[in-house]
Amino acid sequence: MKIIKRNGTTVNFDASKIYNAMHKEANSVYVVSEDLDSNLKRIARTIEAQLLKNGIDAITVSMVQALVEEKLLSAGYLHIAEHYISYRLQRDIERTDYKDKVIVHLRLEQVR
């Protein structure tokens, strides 16, 4: 399976990158326990399995990020999802050259 990056290039899918991104945001919210770490690994594996089961040959980074957000929210990790979404939005703003000091504050209502 391939990932279509924002610049149009493709690379091999790597579920560990999903786990690493979730872990980074979880670590910004909590001290990551063994249980939380295991659950984040499970979520990354679930996303990979779902894509493989559906016969997806290539998927965009944005689509993977949307799946991560969905899985974090459905697993009840609202604060981690909030931080993940906020970081993603900040990076999107930076990528589009809006380098003003924009601070994105998300509330639970906005995540839903």
How would you label these PLM feature ranges?
Residues 1-112:
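Extended catalytic cores of very large enzyme megasubunits
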